[in-house]
């Protein structure tokens, strides 16, 4: 059997192959993992896709991902449970008569590759020293983790920005207790943004700015009180002077008794 005969025998197999899926990637947010891909060029409309994951050196079918349609994705959250383990996945296009080559994803490490979402932030006012409370978000993937607070949401970078001029400073906070933000200008608006901070995962999303006004400076009432007291004192002195002066006038116009009117005046 010549080489051309062998080539002709294998030609139908080559022609019957489906285009392999492209752009295979694992998207992870707060330990919720999803495998996505695009159909290969000229993939038939009746094509289904099947997903396998690598477990202990063997490929196994992912539950719920055996007959996916175009533009569907595969949920790997229940499959990639251990954040300290590394995983791979592959997808294959299938019809009733054809199959494609399998397309592999990149090596995935949940601990370092997942995107950490923003924490839950609350700011309660206490004058010029607002209280900041930071708690981890909730998700199906984080609930499966052994200790999401200790792993991912233990420390945070808090940026405090004054809206009037854009000046800002940063501080470290934890999720175990409330933090007092001190040394703020009275009567100014400040916005607080909190981002998860870990030494092993650089992928994180900051929270939305939480803005609040500090209390204005209390008015100094001492000068006002002193002014009122001075005015009142002057009024009292003025009234006393008027009373005394009026008494003297009355005494000057009052007629003398007859016994005194007969007494000659000095120099008279």
Swiss-Prot record:
Extracellular-facing ranges: 17-223
Record's signal peptide: 1-16
Disulfide bonds: 65-74, 191-211
InterPro entries on file: FN3_dom, FN3_sf, Ig-like_fold, Interferon/interleukin_rcp_dom, Type-II_Cytokine-TF_Rcpt
Residues that span the membrane, as ranges: 224-244
Gene Ontology annotations of biological process type: type I interferon-mediated signaling pathway
Induction details: In the fibroblastic RTG-2 cell line, induced by polyinosine-polycytidylic acid (poly(I:C)), a synthetic analog of dsRNA, that binds TLR3.
Function text: Together with IFNAR1, forms the heterodimeric receptor for type I interferons (including interferons alpha, beta, epsilon, omega and kappa). Type I interferon binding activates the JAK-STAT signaling cascade, resulting in transcriptional activation or repression of interferon-regulated genes that encode the effectors of the interferon response. Mechanistically, type I interferon-binding brings the IFNAR1 and IFNAR2 subunits into close proximity with one another, driving their associated Janus kinases (JAKs) (TYK2 bound to IFNAR1 and JAK1 bound to IFNAR2) to cross-phosphorylate one another.
Name this protein carries in UniProt: Interferon alpha/beta receptor 2
Keyword line: Cell membrane, Cytoplasm, Disulfide bond, Membrane, Receptor, Signal, Transmembrane, Transmembrane helix
Family to which this protein belongs: Belongs to the type II cytokine receptor family.
Ranges of the Cytoplasmic topological domain: 245-268
Gene symbol of the encoding locus: ifnar2
């Amino acid at each position: 059997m010549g080489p051309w005969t062998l080539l002709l025998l294998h030609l139908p197999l080559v022609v019957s192959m489906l285009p392999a899926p492209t752009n295979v990637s694992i998207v992870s947010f707060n330990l919720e993992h999803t495998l996505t891909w695009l159909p290969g060029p000229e993939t038939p409309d009746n094509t289904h896709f099947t997903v396998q994951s690598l477990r202990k050196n063997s490929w196994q079918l992912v539950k719920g991902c055996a007959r996916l349609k175009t533009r569907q994705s595969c949920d790997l959250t229940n499959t990639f449970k251990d954040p300290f383990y590394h995983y791979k996945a592959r997808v294959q296009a299938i019809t009733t008569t054809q199959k494609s080559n399998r397309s592999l994803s990149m090596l995935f490490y949940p601990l370092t590759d997942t995107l950490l979402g923003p924490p839950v932030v609350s700011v309660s006012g206490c004058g010029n020293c607002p209280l900041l409370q930071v708690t981890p978000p909730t998700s199906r993937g984080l609930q499966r983790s052994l200790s999401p607070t200790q792993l991912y949401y233990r420390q945070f970078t808090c940026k405090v920005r004054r809206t009037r001029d854009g000046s800002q400073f940063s501080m470290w906070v934890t999720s175990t207790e409330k933090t007092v933000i001190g040394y703020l200008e009275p009567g100014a608006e400040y916005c607080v943004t909190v981002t998860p901070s870990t030494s092993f995962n650089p992928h994180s999303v900051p929270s939305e700015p939480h803005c609040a006004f500090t209390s204005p400076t209390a008015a100094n009432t001492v000068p006002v009180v002193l002014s009122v007291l001075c005015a009142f004192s002057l009024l009292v002195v003025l009234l006393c002077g008027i009373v005394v002066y009026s008494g003297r006038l009355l005494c000057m116009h009052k007629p003398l008794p007859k016994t005194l009117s007969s007494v000659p005046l000095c120099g008279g």
